[in-house]
Amino acid sequence: MARVKRAVNAQKKRRTILESAKGYRGQRSRLYRKAKEQMLHSMTYSYRDRRARKGDFRKLWITRINAATRQNGMSYNRFVQGLKAAGVEVDRKILAELAVNDSQAFAALVDVARQNLPEGAA
């Protein structure tokens, strides 16, 4: 059986880890073992935060929509209830975009929601 020399593969593996750890502080960018540990943590944080980002944006959109609806004399939950009753299917991302960039169109949606609220809800 032929002898297998693993120096090339090991060096390549270490080099890729150290290259991806570039920019880290201190030993974490220079020593292989420290860099590898930091890369594992970094990947964990990236994975977690890619999922958390979705909730963060939803909270931001809801905050913006709530502020705009209150300027138009209505609360967020009544606004959403009225839109649902009217059959308007616009997601929160678009509603927040309208609230920031096109206040007249948003005010029209608030009026639609207000007209379609059930009796006693307003």
From Swiss-Prot:
Pfam families according to UniProt: Ribosomal_L20
Keyword Ribosomal protein applies: yes
GO molecular function annotation: rRNA binding; structural constituent of ribosome
Source taxon at top rank: Bacteria
CC per GO annotation: ribonucleoprotein complex; ribosome
Keywords: Ribonucleoprotein, Ribosomal protein, RNA-binding, rRNA-binding
InterPro entries attached to this UniProt entry: Ribosomal_bL20, RIBOSOMAL_L20_CS, Ribosomal_protein_bL20_C
PROSITE patterns: RIBOSOMAL_L20 (PS00937)
Biological processes annotated in GO: ribosomal large subunit assembly; translation
Entry keyword annotation includes NAD: no
NCBIfam families: rplT_bact
Described function: Binds directly to 23S ribosomal RNA and is necessary for the in vitro assembly process of the 50S ribosomal subunit. It is not involved in the protein synthesizing functions of that subunit.
Protein family: Belongs to the bacterial ribosomal protein bL20 family.
Protein name, entry field: Large ribosomal subunit protein bL20
Natural source organism: Saccharopolyspora erythraea (strain ATCC 11635 / DSM 40517 / JCM 4748 / NBRC 13426 / NCIMB 8594 / NRRL 2338)
Gene symbol of the encoding locus: rplT
